Amino acid sequence: MANLKVMDQNGKDSGEVTLNDKVFGIEPNESVVFETIIRQRAGKRQGTSKVKNRSAVRGGGKKPWRQKGTGRARQGSIRSPQWRGGGTVFGPTPRSYAYTMPRKQRRLAIKSVLSQKMIDKDLIVLDKLAMSAPKTKDLVSMLNSLNVDGKVLIVSDDNNVQLSARNLAKVKAVPVNGLNVEDAVNYGKLILTQDAVKKIEEVLA
């Protein structure tokens, strides 16, 4: 079990928290993290590309010329794939690019990212994080108090925190159940509350 300093919203010490080694202390598996990010990005693809095959192209119902006697190659439709303006063979059609991964792999990926944050000292734990109203200025002030710069991912169930972060280019706030591998990798610093740590450990430990 590893101990990590806990701070309040003003950047002052507020005790320590003991982190579960099964979640925050494993050997990071980069290949599983990579596969998980590829899966997440695949699930975001629109998959709406579509072309027309010979049955979808308008026209071409009449045989262009008789079968025999003209000296030309036999043709059944002017919308056959070999014709200019004809249908496309094996072209893209609307589909979902999403696919599944085993639950153990998904959990190993997020645990690997959390453990890497611990190794890199990019994990910050707050005793609590709450805002009375959505104010971006207050959130910026809090981040300055914590001496945090660069890209920051905040994990908090407080809706006001999530709304306050929407207008900041390098800050993103997600609920605990919205914590994912791609965001955790893309954002340098990770800010968790003690309640968030507890919920994460309940699921992953």
From Swiss-Prot:
Where is composition skewed (Basic residues) in this entry? 51-71
Alphabetically, the GO molecular function entries are: rRNA binding; structural constituent of ribosome
Family annotation (InterPro entries): Ribosomal_uL4, Ribosomal_uL4-like, Ribosomal_uL4_dom_sf
Q: Which UniProt keywords apply?
A: Ribonucleoprotein, Ribosomal protein, RNA-binding, rRNA-binding
Region Disordered: which residues? 43-96
Q: Which Pfam families match?
A: Ribosomal_L4 (PF00573)
Gene Ontology terms: biological process = translation
Give the UniProt entry's GO cellular component terms. ribonucleoprotein complex; ribosome
Family per similarity comment = Belongs to the universal ribosomal protein uL4 family.
Instruction: Quote the function comment for this protein.
Output: One of the primary rRNA binding proteins, this protein initially binds near the 5'-end of the 23S rRNA. It is important during the early stages of 50S assembly. It makes multiple contacts with different domains of the 23S rRNA in the assembled 50S subunit and ribosome. Forms part of the polypeptide exit tunnel.
PANTHER family with a match to the protein in the record: 50S RIBOSOMAL PROTEIN L4, LARGE RIBOSOMAL SUBUNIT PROTEIN UL4M
Under HAMAP family, the record lists: Ribosomal_uL4_B
Q: How does it assemble?
A: Part of the 50S ribosomal subunit.
Please give the NCBIfam families that the UniProt record associates with this protein.
rplD_bact
* Protein name per UniProt: Large ribosomal subunit protein uL4
Q: Which organism is it from?
A: Lactobacillus helveticus (strain DPC 4571)
